[in-house]
Regions:
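Conserved FAD-binding catalytic core of PHBH/FMO-like flavoproteins
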Residues: 55, 138-242
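Glycine-rich FAD cofactor-binding loop and adjacent beta-loop-alpha segment at the N-terminus
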Residues: 4-6, 10-72, 97, 101
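C-terminal helical "tail/cap" subdomain of flavin- and related membrane-associated enzymes
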Residues: 231, 290-363
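FAD/FMN-dependent oxidoreductases across multiple families
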Residues: 216-300
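Generic enzyme active-site microenvironment
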Residues: 30-31, 146, 263, 270
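Conserved N-terminal helical subregion
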Residues: 53-157, 163-175
């Protein structure tokens, strides 16, 4: 079918686009390179209010607020010292959910539209269509959306120009039972960042995200940091962690090339310090939703507008992350007292803190 839309990648971003196309009665097909879905209950995501509202409009049965965990207060520390508290009386800061749960909920109603085990190895474009080739089959469509993550095969085949760099850190995740009071905690130290995100399942848990530059045993380092910096959270010993991948940033200079459009991590990836990667990908889908007919028809001004506006937002987030990483991730180069006093100064201005929360909740 040459008028169908091809979506490469069946992660959350790919499923968001699929739900959008399904809602508009536009034919589509999802190509997934893996032969099965891999689950990890320790992985969580923080969703903004913008993201939740948009996702709920795509599927009336999703109702994220009914099963996810709201964050009412976020506390930021430099080592052991609390320097900044972000809270909002009438509106939660963000919402935490297991990535597997979000994915399985988004997957409902799309199962028959996904073809597993289809790794793209070549592509061919014409004036009105694009054909993607796998080892065993070819798929033709009007447009292809690259939603296949940070190491996007489709992006590589399309020869996008990409800027990238490594942070010199690895990321690990864990899940530990603890009373959380709907509070998130983030610790900045010389060895990296340590976040505790509240998660309510059968019991209360903290989802732990640990980004570190240490080369010794990361589990031992994590438990040492918890003991030294986060004793007041009453968290027991973490028995196991998963992950360990190298953290890198990449940004495609344009989000479209020919009949290929990048969405989410395929176009831009971010340090998990800010927890905004998925939200920005959903923001990409929100822009596409507002201009869907033009974009899937290959309208060049519409695709240029998508690329320019989304990359502006992505550049803003990159600047914020680089500023935080430069200060806290390399705090050996700055006086600890300078960092502490800077955060405490900001903590005295409610309007400034409101602006931070407002920006964080915009995709």
């Amino acid at each position: 079918m040459s008028n169908q839309i091809l979506i490469v990648g069946s992660g959350v971003n790919g499923l968001v686009l699929a739900k959008l196309l399904q809602q508009r009665d536009i034919p589509f097909l999802i190509l997934e390179k893996n032969s099965q879905f891999f689950e990890n209950p320790e992985r969580t995501v923080a969703l903004t209010n913008d993201s939740i509202r948009f996702l709920n409009t795509l599927d009336k049965n999703l109702d994220i607020n009914a099963w996810a965990t709201p964050v009412n207060n976020m506390l930021l520390y430099q080592d052991t010292e609390l320097n900044l508290s972000l809270n909002k009386d009438e509106q939660k800061i963000s919402t935490i959910c297991q990535l597997d749960t979000l994915h399985s909920q988004m997957l409902k109603g799309l199962e028959k539209k996904i073809i597993m085990g289809q790794e793209i190895n070549a592509m061919k474009e014409s004036e009105r269509s694009i054909t993607l080739h796998t080892e065993s089959k070819s798929y033709k469509g009007a447009m292809a959306f690259g939603c296949d993550g940070i190491n996007s095969t489709l992006r590589g085949l399309s020869e996008f120009v990409v800027d990238e760099w490594y942070y010199g850190q690895k990321a690990y995740v864990a899940l530990v039972e603890a009373e959380h009071k709907n509070e998130a905690h983030q610790f900045f130290s010389q060895s990296g960042t340590l976040a505790f995100l509240p998660l309510s399942l059968d019991k209360q848990y903290y989802s732990i995200i640990f980004c570190t530059n240490v080369t010794t045993d990361p589990l031992n380092e994590l438990n040492t940091l918890i003991k030294n910096n986060a004793k007041h959270l009453n968290i027991g010993e973490v028995k196991s962690i998963s992950g360990g991948h190298d953290l890198k940033h990449h940004s495609a200079k344009s989000l479209h090339s020919g009949r290929v459009v990048l969405c989410g991590d395929a176009g831009n990836s971010f340090h998990p310090m800010a927890g905004q990667g998925l939200n920005l990908g959903i923001g990409d889908a929100m822009h596409i939703a507002d201009n869907l007919d033009k974009i899937i028809s290959g309208n060049l001004p519409a695709m240029n507008d998508y690329s320019a506006k989304r990359n502006t937002k992505n550049a803003q987030m990159t600047w914020i992350i680089q500023s935080l990483f430069g200060a806290f991730g390399n705090s050996v180069g700055l006086s600890k007292s300078v960092l502490n006093e800077g955060m405490k100064f900001l903590d005295k201005f409610p309007k400034a803190k409101e602006k931070i929360i407002e920006f964080a909740n915009k995709n």
